[in-house]
Amino acid sequence: MQIFVKTLTGKTITLEVESSDTIDNVKSKIQDKEGIPPDQQRLIFAGKQLEDGRTLSDYNIQKESTLHLVLRLRGGMQIFVKTLTGKTITLEVESSDTIDNVKSKIQDKEGIPPDQQRLIFAGKQLEDGRTLSDYNIQKESTLHLVLRLRGGMQIFVKTLTGKTITLEVESSDTIDNVKSKIQDKEGIPPDQQRLIFAGKQLEDGRTLSDYNIQKESTLHLVLRLRGGMQIFVKTLTGKTITLEVESSDTIDNVKSKIQDKEGIPPDQQRLIFAGKQLEDGRTLSDYNIQKESTLHLVLRLRGGMQIFVKTLTGKTITLEVESSDTIDNVKSKIQDKEGIPPDQQRLIFAGKQLEDGRTLSDYNIQKESTLHLVLRLRGGN
């Protein structure tokens, strides 16, 4: 069948393909016609960047479909990785490399399996699926490599009565695991335990190594008295959820309860009270949230952000987007909200008309940026 590939210069290339062709094959055909190396090609269809190993039929690309070709400038760069022994490793990477890719490169150089590597930049532990550009890691940035050692150690837990409990743990144990070990020894249910280290309340899903808890560290155990209260959580759709909580509950705990009720992952939740966004490690009592208080829940799309779109009538529309969304995606979201077909929309930012195949990040459109929407009258340009 025939498909079309449109470049940013406006040129359209026609390719003969089969639905079983992979995206790699298509990139090779483009190289044959245009001389552009596959590793500099990004192909976009229906607002999605296409992955090399997938086939055209995987993406439901049919005859006479149009793909958009965006060039990936050779964006090789060097970064440094510093180990705890003080050794510095130099890596050749691209901003689009994922943290997994970087760990594989470290394995190639140093022989350390990726699952024993933790990479830190600007004080943050880097997540495998994210890219270097997601973390704004630029050329000659230095990452820190911490090894996740296999193997156990002892830690101490001190109660308010002054009693000290000794536990056998591993750095990869989660706080939940530690609470279960305390329950085994002392019979205290995990939901009545609050663990404190270095002045911080420890969150259940995190590991000991996340908090830099090492052998012979001492944690403090505070009991959470039963004696709950009800609070309300109001969503943007106007729905109100009732939760049973305690003043000593952390914001993380509250988000977990919302997940149990509504199925919304905590990392997509933003909670607002008295105009303030609530921070995960803090407790309800830190914010003076009392019984029958109402919190507001705003959804955070993955890696998402809000942008505004202003129409000529002066109306402003708020959209939840991601930097990797293409202009097509944004037009579809506007259609969902306002009913305006994408082909009648022209979007302007910083005086430039935005092109469909490009992404928000291509135009450096960041959270709370304002785009302008101009309607394209039928029959005109």
From Swiss-Prot:
Keywords: Cytoplasm, Isopeptide bond, Nucleus, Repeat, Ubl conjugation. Ubiquitin exists either covalently attached to another protein, or free (unanchored). When covalently bound, it is conjugated to target proteins via an isopeptide bond either as a monomer (monoubiquitin), a polymer linked via different Lys residues of the ubiquitin (polyubiquitin chains) or a linear polymer linked via the initiator Met of the ubiquitin (linear polyubiquitin chains). PROSITE patterns: UBIQUITIN_1, UBIQUITIN_2. CDD domains: Ubl_ubiquitin (cd01803). This is Polyubiquitin. There is a cross-link at G76 (Glycyl lysine isopeptide (Gly-Lys) (interchain with K-? in acceptor proteins)). Ubiquitin is encoded by several different genes. UBI1 and UBI2 genes code for a single copy of ubiquitin fused to the ribosomal proteins eL40A and eL40B, respectively. UBI3 is a polyprotein with one copy of ubiquitin fused to ribosomal protein eS31. UBI4 is a polyprotein containing 5 exact head to tail repeats of ubiquitin. The lineage of its organism: Eukaryota, Fungi, Dikarya, Ascomycota, Saccharomycotina. Its main location: cytoplasm. SMART domains: UBQ. GO terms for cellular component: cytoplasm; cytosol; nucleus; peroxisome. The keyword Repeat applies. The keyword Repeat applies. One of its GO terms (molecular function) is ubiquitin protein ligase binding. Belongs to the ubiquitin family. SUPFAM superfamilies: Ubiquitin-like. Residues 1-76, 77-152, 153-228, 229-304, 305-380 form the Ubiquitin-like domain. One of its GO terms (biological process) is modification-dependent protein catabolic process. InterPro entries: Ubiquitin-like_dom, Ubiquitin-like_domsf, Ubiquitin_CS, Ubiquitin_dom, Ubiquitin_ubiquitin-like. There is a cross-link at K6, K11, K27, K29, K33, K48, K63 (Glycyl lysine isopeptide (Lys-Gly) (interchain with G-Cter in ubiquitin)). Residues 381 form a propeptide. It comes from the Eukaryota. It is found in: Cytoplasm; Nucleus.
